[in-house]
Amino acid sequence: YMDFTSGIGVTNTGHCHPKVVQAIQAQAETMIFGMVNIVISPATLALAESLDEVTPTTIDRFFFANSGAEAVEASVKLARHATRRRNIIVFQGSFHGRTAQAMAMTTSKTIYRYDYQPLPGGVVVAPFPYSFHYGWDDVQTTEFCMRQLDLLLKSQSAPEETAAIIIEPVLGEGGYVPAPLEFMQALRALCDAHDILLIVDEVQSGCGRTGKFFSFEHAGIEPDIIVMAKGLGSGLPISGIASRRELMEHWKPGTHGGTYGGGSAIVAAGALASVQVIREEHLVENAAKMGEHLQVGLRKLQEEHSVIGDVRGRGLMVGVEFTAPEGKPDAAIAKAVQQACLERNMLLLTCGSYDNVIRWIPPLIVNEQQIGQGLHIFAEALEKNNMT
C-alpha cells in the first residue's frame, strides 16, 4: 500500500526510518524510563535542546506529555494560571482532542462531543477564516472574521477575562483549511493589543508538515505557546508545549505534571531522532516542493472534474473538497473516491464537518514519482465513479 495518511500526520519520517529505529534500540539498552521529577534522561534534555533550535528565540521552555489532547490541556492550564483569566477563544471547525477540556474546545463534528455534556465551561467559539465556505477571497474573509472577533470580545468574553486564543494554523479535522496569512498576523496584533496569549495548535501541522517546521512561520509571527505532537515522535506517544520562561515560571513545582511526560527515555530518543531526520534530510524543504507538485496535479484534475470544489493546503497538508452541482458539500462523492483509491492500494482519509474533504498527508520523505503515482490513482478513482 501507498500510505498517504501517515497515521493521520504521525509518521512524517516514514514508517520505521532506520535512524529512528536505531535510536529506539540503543536507548532501550541503557535507560527505559526516568521520572522527570526525579531524574531527567539525557535523551529528554537533548530533545529539548533540539526543539530549542527550531522554535522562535523567545521560546525557550518545554513541557512534554503523551498525546495531543494532553498538550492542549497543558497549554490551557498554563494560559489560565499565568494570566489569572478564565476564558479561552477557539475557532469553528477546530479539533483539539478528546479529553474533557480539549473536547469542550473541539467544534469540527458533533460526534466528538455527543452525549458527553456538560463539558467544561469558559470556552467561546469564533468563526474560522474558511474562505471557500464563505465564497470570499482571503482579504474579505479576514476582515469579516476579525470583525467577529472584535464583537465577541465586546459581547461574550471581555479581554480582561480572556486568557488565550487558540488556533490551528491549518484547520485539521475541520477540513484542511489554511488560515490566511493576513488573518494570522491580524490575530497576533489583536492578542498583543489586549494582552491575550496566542496558542498555536501545531499537533497536525507541525514538524515540517506544511513546508516550514511549524506552520505559523509562514505568517512571520511568534506565538506565546506552541502545542506539538503527532509527527514529533514518528509513531511514538509524545507531545509537548513550548513557551517563554516568564510564562512557564508561573508553574511552580507540582502545579502541573505527569508520570510519563518526558519520562520515557525511549520515546524521547525516538523523538530526538525524528527531529534530526527532518532537519538533516531536508524534509521541510521536500514537503514544500512535493506539496507544490501535488497541488499543481490536483488543480489539473479540478479543471476536469466539477465535483472538486476546492484544492487547498500548505506543503504536504492538502485538502480536496467535493461539492454537488449546486455547491453543497458532498460526502458521498468523497467517500466513493476514497474507497476507489483504497481498492488501488492507496490510503487516504476524509475530514471536514460534512466529511466531504479528502486530505493528503503523505510522509515527508515522499518523492515526485510517488506523488505522480498517487495522482494517477486519484484520477482513476474519479473516472471510475464517472465524476465530471
Task: Name each model-derived stretch.
Residues 1-388:
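Conserved N-terminal phosphate-binding loop of PLP-dependent enzymes in the Aspartate aminotransferase
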